[in-house]
């Protein structure tokens, strides 16, 4: 198998929604094209992660552009589609040059593929129908002529299209009834003939020698032969699905048994010598792995985070599957009370691959895919401490990507939002838990009239629109046409980091605390790289999701700067105990003042939510910090971790590390925890 890469690029992929309840979301994946497969992988920190899916080149039937939807966001301006035997994949390139390159490379590789489409759908499949023709079935015939078809279909290498030799036991049917005189079912019928002696295949004209022949109507799913013989078995060939191989059955007690087990319907017409057998539509055994569709898959969650979530569940056999630190590998994390431990124990089982590329946890039980492996072990422990009983999900009813209205604001319909309960309150109003369209959980920040100027409101909304990162709270839209104004964001179920530390901190390991700091650092590194200053980074302004991922929130004071520096107006309120010296002396903000605040946040995390400088008021803090006083080492922080947070508190901003440098310092401390 040729695994040499032809083309690699980070592209945006739309979920295929193979299940009715699957979310319609968009994710960046590293796409890799080889001679045999188009695969896509997770990609993080310049490293290829686990494979998320793969399509065999020989199964691809069409590759073409897709017409843009109305009000398409900037990042989805260059879509193309890949139609293959088992589905439809939409991919978005970053520019026209990239899209053209992928179309050219893919069309080159699928040249001569069987069953290329003459027509395709030029519009997206959205909300249960194609936008181009309004057909509601994803497998519906295309409505637009595919211009590339003629070139890709006719330029076929003879060797590539030659039928492989059938086994010797293939049944020969004497050509007693001329094929051309048979009742042809329809123009869409594909006629295949195979000469078992000359090893050649023919089109509609029959050869002179005896042939094994089969005729298949791809619309009605019927197969036509020359004589009704129920000791025969008609098998669709893997390489040419509309061609059928005719075999003698090895044994059968009666023709009725064979008929009942191999056909749904049989119609015999002896006057025309035509057989019509209906077969159920076959399904591919090589199912594409889309693990994100399964509740038990947690993705890039760490070992310590998985242990915390499983212990919170506290049920015998609670489990999840996560990406291993070894690229492309998976780990099953499983909770049990079987061991003499009051808290229970969590075991981590690596998913191994044998010489035949089968997956297993216990060597005697091997499977083609992760879902099949998990299904088996949900019923059999097979060497594990207990069987997999209760999947622990890290997924929630998240909102699909927002739909831009094209004017820089996402305006949502107020009547589509139902307010459920108050989550908290602040200087500008209250935050409520809500349901959007009766389905999706959202947080609604309700801005009281007069509490925020219109300019301030649009400043915060526009800032949030520009920021999209897994470690930043997602912005969904606004309701700005009447008061109270709504700012609608992602709902984060475990609330603010500060409260979580105070209520759950005693059950957290130092490695889990470090993971929380790393999450925040990732979000801040993103802001830093896009020249945004947060100005109010603290544990109270970060939120903890149900998978224990921590996300940076509260962008009310965030500013975009051209030179990494912002001077605030006199009289502006700021959080003194989280502020760098240049802030409380000169009102001067930069990403390095955010770094100072991050050091304070790390201290909050490792002290489980204590108030920094708790013995001093604000004026005393200004004096102490100006004199060189710094916070002490929390007892849960190692010397190495304390050195990292202490480096954030250098008096000179230029001597403090960047967030990217902080990530590099924390990463080695996480490595031992990721197995």
From Swiss-Prot:
Coiled coil: none annotated. Residues 4-111 form the PH domain. The active site is at 536 (proton acceptor). A zinc finger (Btk-type) spans 113-149. Highly expressed in cells with great migratory potential, including endothelial cells and metastatic carcinoma cell lines. A motif (CAV1-binding) lies at residues 596-603. Keywords: Apoptosis, ATP-binding, Cell adhesion, Cytoplasm, Kinase, Metal-binding, Nucleotide-binding, Phosphoprotein, SH2 domain, Stress response, Transferase, Tyrosine-protein kinase, Zinc, Zinc-finger. It comes from the Eukaryota. Its EC number is 2.7.10.2. Its cofactor is Zn(2+). Belongs to the protein kinase superfamily. Tyr protein kinase family. TEC subfamily. Non-receptor tyrosine kinase that plays central but diverse modulatory roles in various signaling processes involved in the regulation of actin reorganization, cell migration, cell proliferation and survival, cell adhesion, and apoptosis. Participates in signal transduction stimulated by growth factor receptors, cytokine receptors, G-protein coupled receptors, antigen receptors and integrins. Induces tyrosine phosphorylation of BCAR1 in response to integrin regulation. This is Cytoplasmic tyrosine-protein kinase BMX. It comes from Homo sapiens (Human). The gene is BMX.
């Amino acid at each position: 198998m040729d695994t040499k890469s032809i083309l690699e690029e980070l592209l945006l992929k739309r979920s295929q929604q193979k299940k009715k309840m699957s979310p319609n979301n968009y994710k960046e994946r590293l796409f890799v094209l080889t001679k045999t497969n188009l695969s896509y992988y997770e990609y993080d920190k310049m490293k290829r992660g686990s494979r998320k899916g793969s399509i065999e080149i020989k199964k691809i039937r069409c590759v073409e552009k897709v017409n843009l939807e109305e009000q398409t966001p900037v990042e989805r301006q260059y879509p193309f589609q890949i139609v293959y035997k088992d589905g439809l994949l939409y991919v978005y390139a970053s520019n026209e040059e990239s899209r053209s390159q992928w179309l050219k490379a893919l069309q080159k590789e699928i040249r001569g593929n069987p069953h290329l489409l003459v027509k395709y759908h030029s519009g997206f499949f959205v909300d249960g129908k194609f936008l181009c023709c309004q057909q509601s079935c994803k497998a519906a015939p295309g409505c637009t002529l595919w211009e590339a078809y003629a070139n890709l279909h006719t330029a076929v290498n003879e060797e590539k299209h030659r039928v492989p030799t059938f086994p010797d036991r293939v049944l020969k049917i004497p050509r007693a009834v001329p094929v051309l005189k048979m009742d042809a079912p329809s123009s869409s019928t594909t006629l295949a003939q195979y000469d078992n002696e000359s090893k050649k295949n023919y089109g509609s004209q029959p050869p002179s020698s005896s042939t094994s022949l089969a005729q298949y109507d791809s619309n009605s799913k019927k197969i036509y032969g020359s004589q009704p013989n129920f000791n025969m078995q008609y098998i669709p060939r893997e390489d040419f699905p509309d061609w059928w191989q005719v075999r003698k059955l090895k044994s059968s007690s009666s023709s009725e048994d064979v008929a009942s087990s191999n056909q749904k319907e049989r119609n015999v017409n002896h006057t025309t010598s035509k057989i019509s057998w209906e077969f159920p539509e076959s399904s591919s055994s090589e199912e594409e792995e889309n693990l994100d569709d399964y509740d038990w898959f947690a993705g890039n969650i760490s070992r310590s985070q998985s242990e915390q979530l499983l212990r919170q569940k506290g049920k015998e056999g609670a489990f999840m599957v996560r990406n291993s630190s070894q690229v492309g590998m998976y780990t099953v994390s499983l909770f049990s009370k079987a061991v003499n431990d009051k808290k229970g124990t969590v075991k981590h089982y690596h998913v191994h691959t044998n010489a035949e590329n089968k997956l297993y946890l216990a060597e005697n039980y091997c499977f083609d895919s992760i879902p099949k492996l998990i299904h088996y072990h949900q019923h059999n422990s097979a060497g594990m401490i207990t069987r997999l009983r209760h999947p622990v999900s890290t997924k929630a009813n998240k909102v699909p990507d927002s739909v831009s209205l094209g004017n820089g604001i996402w305006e949502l319909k107020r009547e589509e939002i139902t307010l459920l309960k108050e989550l908290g309150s602040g200087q500008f109003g209250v935050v409520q838990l809500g349901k959007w369209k009766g389905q999706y959980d959202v947080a609604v920040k309700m801005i009281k009239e007069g509490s925020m100027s219109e300019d301030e409101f649009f400043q915060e909304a526009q800032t949030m629109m520009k920021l999209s990162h897994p470690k930043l709270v997602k912005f969904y839209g606004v309701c700005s046409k009447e008061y109270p104004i709504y700012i609608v964001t992602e709902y984060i179920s475990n609330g603010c980091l500060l409260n979580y530390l105070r209520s759950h901190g005693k059950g957290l390991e130092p490695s889990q605390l470090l993971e929380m700091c790393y999450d925040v650092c990732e979000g801040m590194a993103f802001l830093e790289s896009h020249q945004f200053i947060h100005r109010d980074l603290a544990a109270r302004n970060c939120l903890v999701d149900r998978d224990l991922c921590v996300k940076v929130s509260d962008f009310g004071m965030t500013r975009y700067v051209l030179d990494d520096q912002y001077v605030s107006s006199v009289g502006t309120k700021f959080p003194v105990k989280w502020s760098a010296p240049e802030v409380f002396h000169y009102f001067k903000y930069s990403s390095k003042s955010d770094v100072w605040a991050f050091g304070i946040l790390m201290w909050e995390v490792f002290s489980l939510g204590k108030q920094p400088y708790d013995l001093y008021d604000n004026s005393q803090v200004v004096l102490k910090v100006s004199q060189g006083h710094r916070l002490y080492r929390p007892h849960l922080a190692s010397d190495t971790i304390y050195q990292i947070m202490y480096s954030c508190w250098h008096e000179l901003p230029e001597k403090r590390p960047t967030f990217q440098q902080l990530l590099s310092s924390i990463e080695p401390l996480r490595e031992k925890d990721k197995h």
